[in-house]
Amino acid sequence: MSYNRRSKNITQGVARSPNRSMYYALGYQKEDFDKPMIGIANGHSTITPCNAGLQRLSDAAVAAVKDAGANPQIFGTPTISDGMSMGTEGMKYSLVSREVIADCIETCVQGQWMDGVVVVGGCDKNMPGGMIALARINVPGIYVYGGTIRPGHWKGHDLTIVSSFEAVGEFTAGRMSQEDFEGVEKNACPTTGSCGGMYTANTMSSSFEALGMSLLYSSTMANPDQEKVDSAAESARVLVEAVKKDLKPRDIITKQSIENAVSVIMATGGSTNAVLHYLAIAHAAEIDWSIEDFERIRKRVPVICDLKPSGQYVATDLHAAGGIPQVMKLLLDAGLLHGDCMTITGRTLAEELKDVPSVPRADQKVIHPIDQALYKEGHLAILKGNLAEDGAVAKITGLKNPVITGPARVFDDEQSALAAILDDRIRAGDVVVLRYLGPQGGPGMPEMLAPTSAIIGKGLGESVGLITDGRFSGGTWGMVVGHVAPEAFVGGTIALVQEGDSITIDAHKLLLQLNVDDAELARRRVAWKQPAPRYTRGVLAKYAALARPANQGAVTG
C-alpha cells in the first residue's frame, strides 16, 4: 500500500513528468515517487541561542525519515529573538512572527503537497506558529522542540536570561556591583537552547506533550544533549507511522486535549502568553475556546511545580525530576486530565503514561504531590472590570498579596516607562499604565519584560502594579496585568486613563477597575480621538490591519 496520499498529486501520471524531472535533479530515483514526502520545517538560525542548535536535530529527523522509507524535504522557517528584541521596536515583530511562521509552513506543505511534516523550532513564537500551521492544514505532523538552555552560574547562584534583565534594575538602583553586573551578563546563557525557566518556549513545548503533538519527555531535554538528537529522530519515525495511519492533527487537537495542555500550563506555572497562543491554536483547529475556559481550568488545577520565574527551579531540574510525564501522571490520577485523548503515537494519553510512577521521587523538590501543591488554584487569572470589559490576563503566583489600589502613571510607549522606572520616578504604590501597545496599536503586542524586570530589580515587585494592552514575557512576574481588551487603539477604557487616576488590581476578586465615575468616563470618551497608525507600510501595517483582539488570540486569519 502506498502512503503518498497527497504527494501523488505532483509525482504521478504522464502530466507530472516535468515535476519528476525536477525531483531527479534533487537525487530522487524512480521508486521514490511512490514514497510519502515528509517536510522538515527547520527553524535553525544563528540569530539566537534558542535556534542555534536546531540543525543537528533537523539532520537527525532527515536521516530518520529516510530510514523509515519516506522522502525528507527540508525547508526553512524564520525566527526572531524575543530576548534580543526586548525593549526595542524589534519586539513588535515577535507576535507577528508567529503568524509568519504559520503561513510559511502552510505555504510549503500545501504548495508542495507534502504528506506530513516535522516542525523543528526553538524560540518562543516558533511553537505556537508551528502548531497553528498544523492545526490549520490538518496534515499529519509532529512538533520537535529544540530543547532548553542549561542554567548559567555566578558566585553560587543559578542564572537565566531573566537574571540579566533584572540585573539592569538592580545595577541602576545601586544594589549590584559592576563586577556582579558583568558576571551575570557573561554567564546567564552558557549553552544553546531556549530560555531555561518555565517561560514561554518551555511553557508551550511542555504543553505540546499534553496536547499529544510531541513525544513524552522531549520538552525538558537540554539542547546540547544527545538525548535531544535521539528524540528528534524518534519523532520523525513516529511521524512517518502517523502518515501511514493517516493520523491527523485534528484527530489529536480537540477541546479535551487543549484542556489537558492548559491544565499542564497551570500545574507548571507557565507563561501568560499561553493564553494568547491557545486561543490562536483553537481558532486554527476550529475549536470553540475562549478566555473563560482558562479561568474554568484555573479554578480546578493547582500549581504543583516550583519553577522560575516565580519559583526556584528551571527546565533541566524538571527533566531530572521526572519531566512533564510525571506532572501529567499526578494530574491524571487526580482526575484533572482526559486520559482518553489520542496522541501522535496512536496511543491514548493514559496509555502513554501507564508506566510513569504515581508518586514523584522523594529526592527532588521540583514536582509536588497534589495534596502538597504550592498553590491550590492555577496562576493565570482572567481579570475583568471597566478597564478590561473583554478581559485581561494576570499571573498571580509569587506574590504575597496580589491586590493594589494606586495612582496611575501613564505611558504611551515602553521606552518612556522604562526610563521613568530606571530614573526612580516610579514609587511604591503606583500603577504603571502602558498603552497603545495592543495587537493593532503596537502593533504586535510587544512584551514588557524590560520594564517589569526593572521594577523587580528596583525592589518594587510587590508594591508597584503594571497594566498594559501589550504582553509580558514568560519570564515576567510581579503585580502585572496584560492583554487588556479592548485595547487603547480602538478606544478601550485604558485609552481614557489620566495621570493620577485611581486604579485597582485585585486578583482575588478577578477585578481590573478604573476608579473614575461613569459620567467622567463618558466625557473623556467623547473627547478621545483614535491616533494615526504607527506604521502604514510593511508587515507591521499588514498585521495591524488584520489582527483580531487579544481575547481572540490576536490572530490574523
Curated annotation (Swiss-Prot):
Cofactor binding notes: Binds 1 [2Fe-2S] cluster per subunit. This cluster acts as a Lewis acid cofactor.
EC identifiers of the protein: 4.2.1.9
Binding, Mg(2+): D82, D124, K125, E447
GO molecular function, one term: dihydroxy-acid dehydratase activity
Pfam families: ILV_EDD_C, ILVD_EDD_N
Catalytic activity: (2R)-2,3-dihydroxy-3-methylbutanoate = 3-methyl-2-oxobutanoate + H2O; (2R,3R)-2,3-dihydroxy-3-methylpentanoate = (S)-3-methyl-2-oxopentanoate + H2O
BP GO annotations: isoleucine biosynthetic process; L-valine biosynthetic process
Keyword Translocase: no
InterPro entries in the cross-refs: DHAD_IlvD/Edd, Dihydro-acid_dehy_C, DihydroxyA_deHydtase, DiOHA_6PGluconate_deHydtase_CS, ILV_EDD_C, ILV_EDD_N, IlvD/EDD_N
Residues reported to bind [2Fe-2S] cluster: C50, C123, C195
Keyword Zinc listed: no
PANTHER family reported in the protein's UniProt record: DIHYDROXY-ACID DEHYDRATASE DAD, DIHYDROXY-ACID DEHYDRATASE, MITOCHONDRIAL
Protein's recorded name: Dihydroxy-acid dehydratase
Underlying gene: ilvD
